[in-house]
Design a protein with these regions (language model features):
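Auxiliary alpha/beta "docking" domains used to position bulky ligands
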Residues: 8-297
Length: 297
């Protein structure tokens, strides 16, 4: 349904904010606690040509609302609970991606049904957004999501170690997806969040530790004997951001849970860590076996 033009300007002034708030409420409940709005133009100005998001010919065009979705360690309890109870997640080939995609679909539906932010540039109901998943690198879907996080004020992209560093969570974040609402105009410059400072730029000791850890991690690829510990070297790069010279065992307070770390770096552990973790989570599978056994009696 379209609104009268006399109401359109007033509605558009808060549309991006209302839509983002509705998405944030739904996504945070699923452990996706990083939800940041930005103007699509800001991203396209810094993105490599192959990773730019083409604006649509109608609607807000280059100034469309983009919403970056990510997570801190908060994702793990929500994900493991779903993996533990829901075969659609627990039996999926890529359960985290499946969980995130489902959470985003549900959040879009919730936001669309809410009163706030339901009107677009035409004065009509907003179409569903285009969704760009960070793991999809196919032509037309590739997004330089770390650069987007940088211009959206989410995390500082350190160009030397290639980590996105959040003010609260440090390097312990994951950037999952981007939603582009072509019918809603994104925030203007007055509402632009500043990029957080790089903590390594003002801490020479931390800079040195991270650079050394990064160089050591790269050396692991040239050293066959280091294959078993290669993933640990990359974890050490993240840990070096917050390393305390007085107590090297002290970890970042927002560091991932240990199983979350191992799951995240599974690609460098031969799949064993992820398989072990998933086997331990499938409580529903044991329940299903017991039920089937009871049915056979």
């Amino acid at each position: 349904m379209c609104r009268p033009l006399s109401l359109l300007a007033r509605a558009m002034a808060s549309a991006w904010s209302a839509r983002t708030a509705a998405l944030r409420a739904a996504l945070e409940a699923q452990g996706l606690d990083i939800v940041a709005p930005l103007n699509l133009r800001w991203y396209n100005e810094v993105a490599p040509e192959t990773a730019r998001i083409a604006p649509t010919a109608n609607g807000a065009g280059e100034d469309a609302l983009a919403v970056l979705v990510g997570n801190s360690r908060a994702l793990w309890p929500a994900f493991t609970a779903a993996h533990d109870s829901d075969p659609a997640i627990g039996d999926a080939e890529h359960p985290v991606d499946t969980f995130v995609a489902r959470a985003i679909r549900a959040a879009i539906a919730d936001a669309s049904s809410s009163r706030g932010g339901s009107t677009g540039m035409s004065g009509c109901d907003v179409r569903d957004p285009r969704v760009f998943d960070s793991h999809d690198t196919s032509p037309g879907k590739l997004v330089a999501i770390q650069r987007m996080a940088h211009v959206a004020g989410v995390a500082h992209l350190d160009e030397k170690c290639h980590l996105s560093i959040h003010e609260k969570h440090g390097p312990w974040i994951a950037l999952r997806a981007v939603l582009v609402f072509d019918d809603i105009e994104g925030p203007d410059e007055a509402n632009r969040a500043s990029t957080p400072p790089n903590p390594l730029a003002t801490n020479a000791a931390a800079r040195s530790r991270v650079d050394a850890a990064f160089a050591f991690a790269l050396e692991g690829y040239a050293d066959p004997s280091a294959s078993a510990e290669r993933w640990q070297r990359w974890v050490a790069v993240r840990d070096a951001v917050h390393a305390d010279p007085a107590d090297e065992t002290r970890k970042h307070p927002e560091r991932y849970y240990e199983d979350q770390v191992r799951y995240h770096y599974n690609c460098q552990t031969g799949g064993d860590a992820r398989a072990r973790i998933r086997d331990g989570l499938r409580a529903y599978a044991a329940t299903r076996v017991r039920k089937e056994a009871d049915d056979d009696v």
